[in-house]
């Protein structure tokens, strides 16, 4: 099909995975009702008029907890393949993983010391 043999299946998958959402959006555009009456523009919240505004200020502590979670979630993404291939990688990969974990533990200690993990 093209210059890289063996990638035909990948190219087919790529084309299909791009075509399906585009086809869904085009179909929605063609078949969806187009009337924009005042009734359709109202917000709906469990059959009642909404109370208060939609824009509220979140406490910064939510952001800090989410940021620390994402950091350690990404750590898991990096360490899982290493753990699966641990027996083939040798001592150097083990030392590199220990350095990676040590850097993240220093970051955790810093966040803890700064009070980012405390809710007061």
Swiss-Prot record:
Transmembrane segments: 6-26, 64-84, 89-109
Cell location: Cellular thylakoid membrane
Record GO cellular component, one term: plasma membrane-derived thylakoid membrane
Cited InterPro entries: NAD(P)H_OxRDtase_bac/plastid, NADH_UbQ/plastoQ_OxRdtase_su3, NDAH_ubi_oxred_su3_sf
Keywords assigned: Membrane, NAD, NADP, Plastoquinone, Quinone, Thylakoid, Translocase, Transmembrane, Transmembrane helix, Transport
Entry's Gene Ontology BP terms: photosynthesis, light reaction
The EC number(s) this enzyme carries: 7.1.1.-
Domain of life, per lineage: Bacteria
Record note on quaternary structure: NDH-1 can be composed of about 15 different subunits; different subcomplexes with different compositions have been identified which probably have different functions.
HAMAP family xref list: NDH1_NuoA (MF_01394)
Protein name (database record): NAD(P)H-quinone oxidoreductase subunit 3
Organism: Prochlorococcus marinus (strain MIT 9313)
The encoding gene: ndhC
């Amino acid at each position: 099909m093209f210059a890289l043999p063996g990638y035909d299946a990948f190219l087919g998958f790529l084309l299909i995975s791009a075509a399906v959402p585009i086809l869904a959006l085009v179909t929605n555009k063609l078949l969806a009702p187009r009337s924009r009456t005042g009734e359709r523009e109202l917000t709906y919240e469990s059959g009642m008029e909404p109370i208060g505004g939609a824009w509220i200020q979140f406490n910064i502590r939510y952001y800090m907890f989410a940021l620390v979670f994402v950091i350690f979630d990404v750590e898991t993404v990096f360490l899982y393949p290493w753990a699966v291939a641990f027996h083939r990688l040798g001592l150097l990969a083990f030392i590199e993983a220990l350095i990676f974990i040590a850097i993240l533990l220093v970051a955790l200690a810093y966040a803890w010391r700064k009070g980012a993990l405390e809710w007061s």
